[in-house]
Each structure stands twice: as structure tokens, then as C-alpha cells.
């Protein structure tokens, strides 16, 4: 991450912490006050990406909200098929061995 991106990220966090709307002008003024040269495009990108979003809420829900749904949904399916899965794997392994022999590409045939 470049210094410009990092400075703009920190500026967005400062604005969110103060409850101020995140705009490109405010991001640029904060980075300018910190004596960091940031191209205006970075401020615009960050402002548009965070527009209408609650940054505090996003940060608080990173671990719990995004990861919880896939884990809960993915855990139920394998638990139901535990009894059948090993038998299927053994059958597939036997089929793979047989298919190698049938092709006749062995080095020592």
C-alpha cells in the first residue's frame, strides 16, 4: 500500500470516528494538514467507495458478519453426508487406479 493510500485510509477513519461525512474534499484537507501529498484521484476513489456506508459498522462486523454465514451454511452439508463420503472416496480411488491400467501408457508394460 502506498503512502497516499495509507494517508487517505487514515483520513477516512478519522472522519468516520468524528461522525463527519466522508467526501473527497475533506479527505484532501486532512491529508494536506498532515503534510502528505495525495493525488486527488485517491480521495475521490475512497469517497465514492465509502459513500452511503457506515465505516464504523463495517469495521465492527468484519469478523462476525462476513465470515459467519458461509461457515454456518457450509458446516451443515458435510455433517449430513459424513457416512457416505468415505465410501465414495474409496470407489473413486479404485476407478482411478483401473483407468491408469487400461490406457496402456505405463513405462514398464
Curated annotation (Swiss-Prot):
Organism of origin: Schizosaccharomyces pombe (strain 972 / ATCC 24843) (Fission yeast)
Low complexity bias (residue ranges): 69-84
Keyword flag Ribosomal protein: yes
Protein name: Large ribosomal subunit protein P1A
The protein's role, per its UniProt record: Component of the ribosome, a large ribonucleoprotein complex responsible for the synthesis of proteins in the cell. The small ribosomal subunit (SSU) binds messenger RNAs (mRNAs) and translates the encoded message by selecting cognate aminoacyl-transfer RNA (tRNA) molecules. The large subunit (LSU) contains the ribosomal catalytic site termed the peptidyl transferase center (PTC), which catalyzes the formation of peptide bonds, thereby polymerizing the amino acids delivered by tRNAs into a polypeptide chain.
Assembly and interaction partners: Component of the large ribosomal subunit (LSU). Mature yeast ribosomes consist of a small (40S) and a large (60S) subunit. The 40S small subunit contains 1 molecule of ribosomal RNA (18S rRNA) and at least 33 different proteins. The large 60S subunit contains 3 rRNA molecules (25S, 5.8S and 5S rRNA) and at least 46 different proteins. The acidic ribosomal P-proteins form the stalk structure of the 60S subunit. They are organized as a pentameric complex in which uL10/P0 interacts with 2 heterodimers of P1 and P2 proteins.
Origin: domain of life: Eukaryota
Predominant subcellular localization, coarse grouping: cytoplasm
MF-aspect GO terms: protein kinase activator activity; ribonucleoprotein complex binding; structural constituent of ribosome
InterPro entries hit by this protein: P1/P2_N_sf, Ribosomal_P1/P2
GO BP term (any one): cytoplasmic translational elongation
Annotated stretches, region: Disordered: 69-109
Any further remark recorded for this protein: Yeasts contain 4 individual small ribosomal A proteins (RPA) which can be classified into two couples of similar but not identical sequences. Each couple is distinctly related to one of the two A proteins present in multicellular organisms.
Keyword DNA-binding annotated: no
GO annotation, cellular component aspect: cytosol; cytosolic large ribosomal subunit
A Pfam family hit: Ribosomal_60s
Comp. bias intervals (Acidic residues): 94-103
Gene: rpp101
Stated family: Belongs to the eukaryotic ribosomal protein P1/P2 family.
Cell compartments where the protein resides: Cytoplasm
Keyword annotations: Cytoplasm, Phosphoprotein, Ribonucleoprotein, Ribosomal protein
